């Protein structure tokens, strides 16, 4: 974890320590509002504080970098009925208390999920693998506790493909950014949001199809 991020999380947790209750917590900072509630009365308050702190660290940065029109108010709900990791819809993020209790250091689940809010692709039927790949790309760039969670982009393997989504796609995107054309990810994100993304988008942005890019990546995947 980056030292300044850790200090910020600890300070924010201390400041807000007495503000959390079993009901609904509404927190405001620098123009952003986070509303936190849930149905698990036994959920670890320390984990909840970290989730909240991470939101106020990463969300404003992501909004500024990717979509300045993104929501200023977000809802977190800790839901015992949800058995995945986390899910986002319409500015509301649902977290699994079972998962977070078992993986208390994986607080950058927040970073991934709030990027989905920032993406705001709406009803666009774009490729889901790219949506998730961009979200993990942003987690890799802006996550505050990836090391603590032992979360990292996987090394390339011949069994992988660009459309495997999540971290595999994210690593490919890092390679495109660093080895092919800087700014590609932001343009892909913007075109997904504007509903102008097509299969030919890769050629327009980089001069190569996504399949050609993947072939080059597979031959020299160092990032």
Q: Predicted regions span which residues?
A:
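Pan-zinc metallopeptidase signature
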Residues: 24, 176-223
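Soluble non-cytosolic domains of exported or imported proteins
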Residues: 45-56, 100-109, 125, 129, ...
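Post-HExxH zinc-binding segment in Zn-dependent metallohydrolases
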Residues: 58, 126-169
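Surface-exposed patches in mature extracellular/periplasmic domains of secreted proteins
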Residues: 63-79, 122-128, 147-154, 173, ...
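Solvent-exposed, polar/charged alpha-helical surfaces in well-ordered, non-transmembrane soluble domains
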Residues: 53-56, 60, 108, 136, ...
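Active-site recognition of the HExxH zinc-binding catalytic motif
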Residues: 108-120, 132-136
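Bacterial Sec-dependent N-terminal signal peptides
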Residues: 1-23
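Juxtacatalytic substrate-recognition/specificity segment
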Residues: 22-114, 198
């Amino acid at each position: 974890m980056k030292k300044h991020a850790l200090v910020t999380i600890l300070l924010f947790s201390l400041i807000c320590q007495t503000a959390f209750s079993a009901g609904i917590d509404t927190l405001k900072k620098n123009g952003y509002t986070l509303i936190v509630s849930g149905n698990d009365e036994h959920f670890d308050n320390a984990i909840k504080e970290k989730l909240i702190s991470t939101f106020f660290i990463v969300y404003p940065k992501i909004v500024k970098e990717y979509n300045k029109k993104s929501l200023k108010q977000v809802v977190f709900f800790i839901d015992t009925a949800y058995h995945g990791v986390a899910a986002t819809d319409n500015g509301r993020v649902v977290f699994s208390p079972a998962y977070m209790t078992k993986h208390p250091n994986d607080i950058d689940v927040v970073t991934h999920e709030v990027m989905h809010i920032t993406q705001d692709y709406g009803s666009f039927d774009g490729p889901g693998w790219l949506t998730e790949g961009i979200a993990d790309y942003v987690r890799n760039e802006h996550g505050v506790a990836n090391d603590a969670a032992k979360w990292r982009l996987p090394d390339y393997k011949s069994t992988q493909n660009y459309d495997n989504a999540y971290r595999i796609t994210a690593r490919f995107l890092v390679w495109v950014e660093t080895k092919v054309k800087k700014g590609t990810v932001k343009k892909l994100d913007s075109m997904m949001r504007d509903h102008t993304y097509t299969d030919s988008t890769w050629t327009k942005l980089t001069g190569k199809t996504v399949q050609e890019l993947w072939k080059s990546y597979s031959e020299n995947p160092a990032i």
